[in-house]
UniProtKB/Swiss-Prot annotation:
Gene source species: Salmonella typhimurium (strain LT2 / SGSC1412 / ATCC 700720)
Pfam families per record: Voltage_CLC (PF00654)
Function: Proton-coupled chloride transporter. Functions as antiport system and exchanges two chloride ions for 1 proton. Probably acts as an electrical shunt for an outwardly-directed proton pump that is linked to amino acid decarboxylation, as part of the extreme acid resistance (XAR) response.
Protein name: H(+)/Cl(-) exchange transporter ClcA
Main location: membrane
Sequence ranges marked intramembrane in UniProt: 109-116, 177-189, 190-192, 193-201, 387-401, 402-404, 405-416, 417-421
Subcellular location(s) per record: Cell inner membrane
Coiled-coil annotated residue ranges, if any: none
Transmembrane segments: 33-69, 77-100, 124-141, 148-166, 215-232, 253-281, 288-308, 330-349, 355-378, 422-438
Length: 473
């Protein structure tokens, strides 16, 4: 009996020692192994939540479209119902953002950049539910927004959540897990692991602290999120455009011309985004009722637009293969391009929870395809394929607007599985970036972050001025 008791006590002591060792390992902030393990956890969680977000948005969209199909034969019901359903869904997203987590509005990528510099708060307990449910509303309503921005912000906030749950106190761990979550989020949104890594290194280069531990953590998180994505969605490219032909050397100058066009379009697009943001701010003045009603009106209009021309509504992933295949005329491509520019400005600049990556990729595809079709008519001797210009255009607008050409190139190649077009992609994106920089254009996300920080400083200064007055009272 005594032997059994002593054996049991010995086993208990061993278990307690193991638990103590694991706890100490997790609490040693400078242990690379602990950070890498946490990065794997962050990547896995981000992949799971990213897939869940994608499925949830698709479910809401299918439910909305299914309700419209039921009344498709009754025009007097169809049009009002399309407006009302999309308006109500959009209002849910706008209300949640404005009421509970204003930092969850828009793409969320500038918020992650600010958090990496310790300039913006990371309230993951608010942002995660608001961004997820709010994004279901706005994206499910058919608004011209993408899911990549929300997934990046969700990933970054999951990184901070894991840090807080495991009580890792070091600044290095805090910074690394936030960046890891953001990279894993982009990878989970686009099934583009290398683009997720490059996005952190290139787009967030002023904020990202590049060292051996941080880059290994980012790699680990991205690998895990990509594995999770492929378990649920398979390994096929996220955008199916088929295998396109190579670009002959004697046609490469046309891609430089296309890059020059996007180099002009990019700064203009950024300027329009910022001006539209100012217009909306003047309209609602921060008043929640006006803001929600405005969002509902925009969502309802997107619902109506989806009936008139489905290609002009939604994030754009369904539009890209159709446009790249040359199924539209040049005139219709330009019409859809202009329409989607307007709807992108209205949806994104109004502060709806949703990203701008996917809409920009769709815009680049439309303009690139139109250019390719026109070039095929003007230069029949080249036997040009418009789809190759569509692929080049996808990354070019992003390169000119966000000022991340390498990310744009790799992202598009991973999404379409057309790696043979890497040379024309480089020429187009480099030309677009250089001209945009020469024209004085500023990177979109950095500019939005600067405006957010200026507003934050102004609000803090106002509070400091009011504090003495309140004390005297």
């Amino acid at each position: 009996m005594k032997t059994d008791t002593s054996t049991f006590l010995a086993q208990q002591i061993v278990r307690l020692r193991r638990r103590d060792q694991i706890r100490r390992l997790m609490q040693r902030d400078k242990t690379p192994l602990a950070i890498l393990f946490m990065a794997a956890v962050v990547g896995t969680l981000t992949g799971l939540v990213g897939v869940a977000f994608e499925k949830a948005v698709s479910w809401v969209q299918n439910m909305r479209i299914g309700a419209l199909v039921q009344v498709a034969d009754h025009a007097f019901l169809l049009w009002p119902l399309a407006f009302i359903l999309s308006a109500l869904l959009a209002m849910v997203g706008y209300f949640l953002v404005r009421k509970f987590a204003p930092e969850a509005g828009g793409s969320g990528i500038p918020e992650i950049e600010g958090a990496l510099e310790e300039l913006r708060p990371v309230r993951w307990w608010r942002v995660l539910p608001v961004k997820f449910i709010g994004g279901m509303g706005t994206l499910g309503a058919g608004m011209v927004l993408g899911r990549e921005g929300p997934t990046v912000q969700i990933g970054g906030n999951l990184g901070r959540m894991v840090l807080d749950v495991f009580r890792m106190r070091s600044a290095e761990a805090r910074h690394t897990l936030l960046a890891t979550g953001a990279a894993a989020g982009l990878s989970a949104a686009f099934n583009a692991p290398l683009a997720g890594i490059l996005f952190i290194i290139e787009e967030m280069r002023p904020q990202f602290r590049y060292n051996l531990i941080s880059i290994k953590a980012v790699f680990t998180g991205v690998i895990m999120s990509s594995i999770v994505f492929r378990i649920f969605n398979g390994e096929a490219p996220i955008i199916e455009v088929g295998k396109l032909s190579d670009a002959p050397v004697n046609t490469l100058w046309l891609y430089l011309i296309l890059g020059i066009i996007f180099g002009c379009v990019g700064p203009v697009f950024n300027s329009l985004v910022l001006r539209t943001q100012d217009m909306f701010q003047r309209f609602h003045g921060g008043e929640i009722k006006k803001w929600v009603l405005m969002g509902g009106a925009i969502g309802g209009l997107c619902g109506i637009l989806g009936l008139i021309e489905p290609a002009a509504a939604g994030g754009g992933f369904n539009l890209i293969p159709i446009a790249a295949a040359g199924n539209f005329s040049v005139g219709l491509l330009l019409f859809i391009f202009i329409t989607r520019v307007v709807t992108t400005l209205l949806c994104f600049s109004s502060g709806a929870p949703g990203g701008i990556f996917a809409p920009m990729l769709a815009l680049g595809t439309l303009l690139g395809t139109a250019f390719g079709m026109a070039a095929a008519v003007l230069f029949p001797q080249y036997h040009l394929e418009a789809g190759t210009f569509a692929i080049a255009g996808m990354g070019a607008l992003m390169a000119a607007s966000v000022r991340a050409p390498l990310t744009g190139i790799v992202l598009v190649l991973e999404m379409t599985d057309n790696y043979q077009l890497i040379l024309p992609m480089i020429i187009t994106c480099l030309g677009a970036t250089l001209l945009a920089q020469f024209l004085g254009g500023k990177p979109l996300y950095s500019t939005i972050l600067a405006r957010t920080l200026a507003k934050q400083d102004a609000e803090q200064a106002e509070k400091n001025q009011n504090a003495p007055a309140d004390e005297n009272t």
